[in-house]
Amino acid sequence: LKQKTALVSFVHMKYFTSIIILTISLIISCNLSDEEVCHLFDQVDCRPPVLTNIETLGAQTVLLTFNEPIDGNFVSLTCLQNSIRSSMVHNQQVTLALNNPIALSEAQTIEGSVRDIRGNSTYFSIKVWAKNENIPTLLINEFTTKGNETHPDRVELVATSRGNIAGVTLYAGTKDAWTDRIILPDRWVERGTYLVINFSEGTLEDGNLKSELQTGLGSNNGCLSLAKNPQYSSTLLDAVVWGNHSTSTHEGFGSKALKDSVNSLYQQGHWESNSCNGSIDSTNSTATRSFCRDSLRDTNSHAEWYICATKAATFGYANSTLRHL
C-alpha cells in the first residue's frame, strides 16, 4: 500500500511539475520576444546588430555605425550603382571606400550583411547621398496651404548666401514623417535667389519646381522642414509650423502624426513651442493670402510670420509688405 501511495504521489508530482513548466513557457512566449527568450535561457547575446547612423564623409567614403561591435571578417556589402574598393571595421563602425564618386543630388544603394562578434548577422539595404560641401544658407520665406488650380500650394525658399542646393530636401512634415518632399537639384545659387516649389497640381510657372507626389500641404494644420540631405541623420536648416488654433483633436494639431512631428522640431530646437497655440495662425490664409516671413527674421517662432493682403502673394520675389488686417 505504501509503495502504491508513493507511486501515485510521484505521478502527481510529475504531472504538477509539467503543468508548472508549461505555464512558465506560455508566460514567456506571451511576454517575451524570441530574442529575449534566447537571451533568458542561454545568457548570450542573440540579437542582430542594428544600423543606427549613415554618414557620407566625402564623395567616395561612407561611414556606417551600428549599435554594437562588428566582426570585420564577416562584412559582405555591395553598391549597386558603384563598386566598393575596401571596407574597414573599427568597433561599431564600418567605413566603406567606393571606386567612383557619388554624384551630387543622386543616391546610390548599398546592401548586404554584417555580423557581430557573437555571430548574429543582419541584412540591410540603404540609400546613401553625396556630401554637399557648399550648401548655402536657406530659409523658408513664403508659402500657401489652401491652393487651387490657378494658385496651387507653393513654398518659397530664399538663399541668404551663395552655394549649391544639391540634395537639400524640403519636407511636407519632417524627415521622420512626411507626406511629400522635394530633393533639390545640382544647382548653384547666389545670395538673394528665390526658389519656388509647387506642392499641389495646378499652374506651374516658368522656373518653378515640383514636389515628388503633388499631394498638397495641410490646409489648416501642418509643418514644413528643410534638411541638408535626405538621409535620416541629416541636419535641419529651417522649419515652420502652422495651425488654425480651433481644431479640437490631438491637442489642437488634428493628428497624432503632426503632434509628434511638431514635438520633434521643438525638441531639436527648430521651433520654439510644441503647443498648437505656438503655431502661425492659419485662419485667415487663402490661396492668394500667403504666409510671409518678416524681413528674413529667423527666431523659430510664429512671431516672425504674417499673412499678406488678398492677391498680394509674391512667389519668386521679395515678400509683400501689405498685410491682411
What does each model-found stretch correspond to?
Residues 179-207:
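Intrinsically disordered, low-complexity Pro/Gly/Ser/Thr-rich segments with frequent PxxP/GP/PP motifs
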Residues 99-107:
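Surface-exposed, short loops/turns at beta-strand junctions within beta-sandwich domains
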Residues 1-10, 14-59, 121:
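Bacterial Sec-dependent N-terminal signal peptides
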Residues 31-45, 55, 121-176, 216-218, ...:
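A structural motif detector for short, solvent-exposed N-terminal "entry" segments of globular domains
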Residues 58-71, 152-162, 227:
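A short glycine/threonine-centered beta-strand motif
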Residues 216-325:
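Conserved beta-structured recognition patch
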Residues 62-86, 168-170:
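Short, surface-exposed alpha-helix to beta-strand junction/turn motifs within ectodomains of secreted
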Residues 114-120:
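Short, solvent-exposed loop/turn segments at the edges of extracellular beta-sandwich modules
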